[in-house]
Amino acid sequence: MKLDFDPGFDITPLSVDEGFRLGADCFDKGTEFRKLDSVRKSLRDPNCDGPENVYAIMMDVGHKKDLPAMQQRMLLYGVVTYAAGQLGDEPIRSQGHIHKVSAHCGWSTPEVYEIWTGKAVIYMQESGQDDPGRCFAVEAGAGDVVIVPPGWVHATISADPKQPLTFGAWCDRDYGFAYADVRRHGGIAWFPLLTAKGKLRWTPNPAYHTSQLTIKPPRDYSDLGLEKGKSIYRQFEEDPDRFLFCLLYTSDA
């Protein structure tokens, strides 16, 4: 699968059934394959049809030479590739979760996304409680970076059913995903739906209180020292401390 943006190390997504191919100078901790049956509880139609493997995910990957620096800073790089197609009338997407409270930070840490190929929407809502708070749908393409603030519910959505979505992300090495709040509401506060022409539209989830959804492009993160157009992995290699804000960041996306 050809990438539209250079991720900064030798990795090729193969498919949601095969995972990834890595260069000889890279390490990984294996690939997980997320099945449709494992995400049904968070879909608008839990009985929908869709690909058996919704996405393939590899947590903890990169150049072998960089692993000690990543471990020392409690940072982890993960990669995900989605199936093409859709889940009933919804696009291919993740379930939606909150990051668990990190043992070494004592709080739910943020995540730095970078899109490699495909069209993405990073959906986020301020809370997993009945009042979801502020809700955003950040539209992103190849090379775009989106940061999810700490403690926010978030889901990654493929906005183009005709092609797979692939992306990488920096997060806390002591990561973990909390799904209970989202599943208790039968999904996120706004469901993405696909029109007959393959375009996204949004409908509120009645299990939550009324909220407003703001659709927006990615913001500029130069205030956090990030360089637009350069892969976030390469930026880490140039300055391994650059992403320590992942463990300290408190601003909005």
Protein language model regions, located:
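Short, charged/polar surface micro-motifs in flexible loops or helix N-caps
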Residues: G85-G88, K119, R173-Y175
